[in-house]
A protein has these predicted regions:
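Extreme N-terminal segment that seeds HTH/winged-HTH DNA-binding domains in transcriptional regulators
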Residues: 1-33, 39, 84-87, 91-95
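Short, flexible coil/turn micro-motifs enriched in small/turn-prone residues
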Residues: 21, 26, 57, 65-66
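Short, Lys/Arg-rich nucleic-acid/phosphate-binding segment
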Residues: 34, 63-74, 78
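N-terminal helix-turn-helix
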Residues: 34-65
Length: 95
């Protein structure tokens, strides 16, 4: 899955949305360790600080958990992931 960035909206919000899609689709399953900020930023072609901002927002939303010694993982709360999946489906239907 490639990264799609457009100029119309803040990059970090687009990265956050794309990470959510990767989590709910199972690309990054529940409990899985995510690649490093630097690796994700390199893959997306963005500044690591921008990627960090997107990932911090995922932490705040409860979709990821950061552990200082072992990095960042997807939440094991499958209910939270399912809620996000339903939100995405609802937004698609509204369009």
């Amino acid at each position: 899955m490639g990264w799609k960035i457009d100029d119309g909206r803040p990059i970090w919000t687009q990265l956050k949305e794309q990470m959510i899609k990767r989590i709910v689709s199972g690309t990054y399953p529940s409990g899985e360790k995510l690649p490093s900020v630097r690796d994700l930023a390199g893959e997306a072609g963005v500044n690591p600080n921008t990627m960090q901002r997107a990932l911090s927002a995922l932490d705040q939303d409860g979709l990821t958990i950061t552990n200082r010694t072992s990095g960042r993982c997807v939440t094991e709360d499958v209910t939270k992931i399912e809620e996000c999946r339903k939100d995405i489906a609802h937004k698609i239907v509204k369009q």
